[in-house]
Swiss-Prot record:
Name the UniProt record assigns to this protein: Translation initiation factor 2 subunit beta
Region annotated Disordered, chain positions: 1-28
Keyword hit for Protein biosynthesis: yes
Pfam families: eIF-5_eIF-2B
Lineage: Archaea, Methanobacteriati, Methanobacteriota, Stenosarchaea group, Halobacteria
Quaternary context: Heterotrimer composed of an alpha, a beta and a gamma chain.
A single MF term (Gene Ontology): translation initiation factor activity
Organism name: Haloarcula marismortui (strain ATCC 43049 / DSM 3752 / JCM 8966 / VKM B-1809) (Halobacterium marismortui)
Gene name for this UniProt entry: eif2b
């Protein structure tokens, strides 16, 4: 049997994989308005999925959205001003690009660490280390 024939046969016998090709997905923000306050209901689950501290993500959101806010006793974020889910999601996506995904291999298997006062992103998958904008 020729190589090309064996390759064709193997490709025919390989089952198709259903589902998404990405293993890392950030939950869509669950947002609701309370007057002039935007409440981010699933903030805790988002931070858990990102593997980052709540305070760090909150600080980024405040800076990116140009507003003030706090984390309430239920773990929800309360931001001053009206922000829709699309704007919050865009801000979280920026956070992921800057502080979660490795700049070399693109995987989310990273940790934030401080070295000589600088905040670095260390990838556990490829070993790369890169400076963040913080």
């Amino acid at each position: 049997m020729e190589y090309d024939d064996m390759l064709d046969r193997a490709m025919e016998e390989t089952p198709e994989i259903d589902g998404t090709s990405e293993r890392f997905e950030v939950p869509d923000p669950d947002i609701r308005q309370e007057g002039n306050v935007t409440v981010y209901e699933n903030f805790q689950s988002t931070c858990s999925r990102l593997g980052r501290e709540d305070d760090h993500v909150m600080k980024f959101l405040q800076n990116d959205l140009g507003t003030s806010g706090h984390i309430d006793e239920s773990g929800r974020v309360r931001l001053t001003g009206e922000f829709d889910a699309t704007r919050i999601e865009a801000s979280i996506d920026e956070y992921v690009d800057e502080f979660v995904l490795c700049s070399e291999c693109g995987l989310p298997d990273t940790q934030l660490e401080r070295e000589q006062g600088a905040l670095l992103l260390r990838c556990e998958a490829c070993g790369a280390r890169s400076a963040t904008s913080e």
